[in-house]
Amino acid sequence: MAVYSRAYDEKFPVVCMDEKPVQFFEEARKSFRSEHTGICYEDNEYIRNGTCSIFLFTEPLRGWRYADAQERRRKADWAKQIDWLLTVQYPDAEKVVLVMDNLNTHTIGSLYETFPPEHAFALANRLEILYTPRHGSWLNIAEIELSALGRQCIGTQRIPDLETLKNLLVPWATDRNLKQRGVSWHFSTDDARTKLRRLYPVLQV
């Protein structure tokens, strides 16, 4: 939580990252819209068409976010997202402070398994990784952005494939970035010590 209280510094941006699985569904029967009422009718039957993973990055203090969908969430997929983040989005940053969940793919080792040692070292040297606690993923602001993405971009519609999803993600992120939609985070370390006091160890003297 203390990292969210840091002043904005473009050389050391605080970026939050999270992932979201998405299932693809094709319509068993084509939907249609009534000419009289304008209501769209969908058949309850659908065909499962695989899954994918959304990778989302957000820099709360800048009001920026980026979402991309990939077929899988392997170590190499995460590593390639980090490579893009550092070389394309933040080429001039000295070090990116990256807040994320402690998943088995979210490690420096994933960089070395994906890229040549020299490039992996260069990427790792520009990262300051902060993992959220095991049961504290809600501390990751990227979860808030994923929630907004779910409501505003995906909703209840049936998405048939990866290309369709990618075509939805780009305008959603672009619109929120243009409107500078940020996150107002007020839960501080002092708040945690008060409201979550039962989770802190008690020193016996």
Segments the model singles out, each with a brief description of its role:
Residues 1-83, 196:
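Extended, low-complexity cationic-aromatic segments
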Residues 11-12, 62, 93-95, 123-128:
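Short glycine-/polar-rich loops that comprise or flank the Walker A/P-loop
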Residues 16-18, 57, 63, 82, ...:
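Mobile genetic element proteins and their domesticated derivatives, centered on retroelements
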Residues 28, 164-205:
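C-terminal domain-tail junction helix/linker
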Residues 41-46, 119-141, 157-159:
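RNase H-like polynucleotidyl transferase catalytic core
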Residues 76-97:
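Short, basic/hydrophobic alpha-helical segments
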Residues 93-107:
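Acidic/histidine-rich, metal-coordinating catalytic segments
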Residues 142-162, 175-179:
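Active-site proximal helix-loop segment of RNase H-like, two-metal nucleases, encompassing DDE(D)
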